[in-house]
Amino acid sequence: MSEGSRLPPPPRLEPRPSQAPLAPVVETLEVLGFVLGSEDYALPLTAVREILKVPPITEVPRAGEDVLGILSLRGTVVTLVDLRRRIGLPCGPFDRKTRVLVVQRDDEPIGLLVDAVTEVVRLRRDEIEDRPAVPGTRHAEYLAGVARPGGALFVLLNLPALLQDL
């Protein structure tokens, strides 16, 4: 190109209004569903680091009644809590469906023993209700709310309350 010939400036682009209205943003929460006894429970999926088959457990003398013992996870000691006992349900036997949900409390991994893991569910915030006020409910502080997606019923657990005082 010679000095005298320059390219014209590019055309100026003007923003166009959107043709379609934006859909409303629906806030959702993904939860991991699991079974304790005959009831469905859930924790936020982001709180669960791993799901394990039940490994060998080492009993710890004088541990709390909720604590089954400890286990080793790739060289890290994990305290194992019987979630049934923790929320006041009767103990049940282990079987091939029994799983350990590994969650985190500060810098310490905690294993929560559950009867079975069922599914990951995406809940809309409007499907989540506050915990019901049921007189005489033991361990009500462990309940965060309930959700009824598609006719199912999940009891949402309050993980910080569950892990407190272990």
Regions found by a protein language model. Give the residues of each.
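An acidic, low-aromatic, low-complexity terminal/linker signal
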Residues: M1-L166
